[in-house]
């Protein structure tokens, strides 16, 4: 009998072991769909991004009008642009749900997979930030100015660092050019990191909702989970298309309909919705360096998750107190997101400060304490 090409060919063998004959726990739920959804998001963003880059001009005098030209004169340019802009939002929705799943079910105990995942998140955030600057609208320009200016909080080398990032003494043509370069390059870096992420994942195999070793009960990925993933794709692509076709500017900022003007500051500078939680943490500290450190800590704290796990059980499935804490944290992040979108005045200042304090307290102090407490309760 001739050998099965899928299992013998050097390249197809790798694909087969990753996507077709991969042994998968039989009880993984829909929360395990987000990894493949992120893959679809990345593919969509790269495809639409390449098509947009073909019509974009990275020059301060032409960037805004080149985007307008793409939307007006290029065949389906408006659709490509709307899919790309809103696709970023869906990318972040998926990655935040993916991280939430990881925290809830203890997936962070696969340390290498988790750490590469956090690096992926940081790279994605950098990509989204530099991409937001490219249309060269008012909020693009001022967002770039404010966020890059944060580097000046670094002691001694801060100002040099900012001017080095800008390529001059203010956000100008060199900044736009290098941001376009980075925005083109980083998604391919994300692709590479994704392969590393998957390599580490397939070393250990997937976690499952019970958090127990499932080697005795595994089923092939295809056709069971490949079909389940297709349902996920449909359920994500439908709202994405709806958003892109019916209200493409819903999540954008109206300031970006005005070309960038260094002489006029928008009344309220704020980033896209997916950065608002970190922006709220930044604003809640009145000191510049302190704010920058808190901003960095709000994301980098994820690296500590494996070290802060004190429970004897891996997942939160049978840990009601930890569950309560987890959903409190979720509500807390949503409050931070809302506060980040509000102006800096009472009562938003104090709400932001309390929410920021609660965010770090839950992750650093309460989760380990409750985990240890639940261990004690197991003895009774």
UniProtKB/Swiss-Prot annotation:
Record carries keyword Amino-acid biosynthesis: no
Matching entries from InterPro entries are given as: Cyt_b/b6_C (IPR005798), Cyt_b/b6_C_sf (IPR036150), Cyt_b/b6_N (IPR005797), Cytb/b6-like_sf (IPR027387), Cytochrome_b (IPR030689), Cytochrome_b_C_euk/bac (IPR048260), Cytochrome_b_N_euk/bac (IPR048259), Di-haem_cyt_TM (IPR016174)
Cellular compartments per GO CC: mitochondrial inner membrane; respiratory chain complex III
> What is its membrane topology?
Multi-pass membrane protein
- List the transmembrane segments: 34-54, 78-99, 114-134, 179-199, 227-247, 289-309, 321-341, 348-368
Other comment: Heme 1 (or BL or b562) is low-potential and absorbs at about 562 nm, and heme 2 (or BH or b566) is high-potential and absorbs at about 566 nm.
What quaternary arrangement does the UniProt entry report? Answer: The cytochrome bc1 complex contains 11 subunits: 3 respiratory subunits (MT-CYB, CYC1 and UQCRFS1), 2 core proteins (UQCRC1 and UQCRC2) and 6 low-molecular weight proteins (UQCRH/QCR6, UQCRB/QCR7, UQCRQ/QCR8, UQCR10/QCR9, UQCR11/QCR10 and a cleavage product of UQCRFS1). This cytochrome bc1 complex then forms a dimer.
What is the protein name given in its UniProt record? Cytochrome b
- Which species is this record about? Bugeranus carunculatus (Wattled crane)
């Amino acid at each position: 009998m001739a050998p099965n090409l899928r299992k013998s060919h050097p390249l197809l063998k790798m694909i087969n072991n990753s996507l077709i004959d991969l042994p998968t726990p039989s009880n993984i739920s829909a929360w395990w769909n987000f990894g493949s959804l992120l893959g679809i998001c990345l593919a969509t963003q790269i495809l639409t991004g390449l098509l947009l880059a073909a019509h974009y001009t990275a020059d301060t005098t032409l960037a805004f009008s080149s985007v307008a030209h793409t939307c007006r004169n290029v065949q389906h340019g408006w659709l490509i642009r709307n899919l790309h802009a809103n696709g970023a939002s869906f990318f972040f929705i998926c990655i935040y749900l993916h991280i939430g799943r990881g925290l809830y079910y203890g997936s962070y105990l696969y340390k290498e997979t988790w750490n590469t995942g956090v690096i992926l998140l940081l790279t994605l955030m950098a990509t989204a930030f530099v991409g937001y600057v490219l249309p060269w609208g008012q909020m693009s320009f001022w967002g770039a100015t404010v966020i890059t200016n944060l580097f000046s909080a670094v002691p001694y080398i801060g100002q040099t660092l900012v001017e080095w990032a800008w390529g001059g003494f203010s956000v100008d043509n060199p900044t736009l050019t290098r941001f376009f370069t980075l925005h083109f390059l980083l998604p391919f870096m994300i692709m590479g990191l994704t392969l590393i992420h998957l390599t580490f994942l397939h070393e250990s195999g997937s976690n499952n909702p019970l958090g127990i070793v499932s080697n005795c009960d595994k089923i092939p990925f295809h056709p069971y989970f490949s079909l389940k993933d297709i349902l996920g794709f449909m359920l994500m692509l439908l709202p994405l298309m709806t958003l892109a076709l019916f209200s493409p500017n819903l999540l954008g900022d109206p300031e970006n309909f005005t070309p960038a003007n260094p002489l006029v500051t928008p009344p309220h500078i704020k980033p896209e919705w997916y950065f608002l939680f970190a922006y709220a943490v930044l604003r809640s500290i009145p000191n510049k360096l302190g704010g920058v450190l808190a901003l960095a800590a709000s994301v980098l704290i994820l690296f500590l998750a494996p070290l802060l796990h004190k429970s004897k059980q891996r997942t939160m499935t049978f840990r009601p107190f930890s569950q309560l804490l987890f959903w409190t944290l979720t509500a807390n992040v949503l409050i931070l997101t809302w506060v980040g979108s509000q102006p800096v005045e009472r009562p938003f200042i104090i709400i932001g400060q309390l929410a920021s304090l609660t965010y770090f307290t839950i992750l650093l102090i309460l989760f380990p304490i409750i985990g240890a407490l639940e261990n004690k309760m197991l003895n009774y």
